[in-house]
Amino acid sequence: MLHGWYGDTKQMIRIGTSTIPSAYILPEILPAFGKTNPNVYFSMNQSDSQKVIDGLLQGIFDIGFTGMPSDHELLECIPFYEDRMVIITPVNEHFLHYRAEKTPDLAAIMHEPVILREKGSGSKKSADSFIESLGMSEDDLNVMARINDQESIKNLVAGGLGISIISEKAAQNLQRENKILVFQLPEHTSHRQFYIVYHKDYIYRDYMKSFIEYVKQYYQS
């Protein structure tokens, strides 16, 4: 059995999280949980999904949030939030022409200069699945950059460097500001899950158990 040590009065939860949960999901969940659990505080570290999983196995984190599942025998991996992947492009006459089409040619759009996430991220795996569904591989793409920061990707797309495939939730703010165009992917390739990940054999304290259950139920309708 694994057991974490904490000071007598500190109710700390060490969280490892991938990019999307860190930027767009946990900012909703943590304040809501904190309202009824004011003595709990969080130490949060952001990296890609694989590093979060590695950190859990190394005892660095108590709880992880990832954009891809883990099948490791020591970890429990529970989906708690569903998102969609979308293509984002600059707002210009060229891409507005695609937008005017009743059914935009996504394969043609993917031949435009593209910005990709680094390997190890759940977003990269989801993007790869869509690209494969088009009968394409990464070798067929005109890759302009590989970047791990979602906000940087969005700003570079808005600035005209290229297109990208990102989380719909992450795209919403710049879409509302008319700084990017968003193209929906086919249903069978667009959906992705986010997961709360934790040790099966960890002796969790009650406030940690409460947080895990709170997250599981937060987006349940």
Label every PLM stretch briefly.
Residues Y6-G7, C77-I115:
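Flexible hinge/capping segments at coil-to-helix
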Residues M12-G16, G64, I88, I115, ...:
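Short, well-ordered beta-strand segments
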Residues K10-E73:
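Central regulatory/effector-binding core of bacterial HTH transcription factors
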Residues I25, L181-S221:
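A late-sequence structural motif
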Residues E76-V86, N142, A171, R176-S190:
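Short beta-strand->loop
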Residues D48-I53, L57-F61, T66, S129-L181:
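Hydrophobic hinge/microswitch elements
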Residues M1-Y6, F211:
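Alpha-helical linker/hinge and terminal dimerization helices associated
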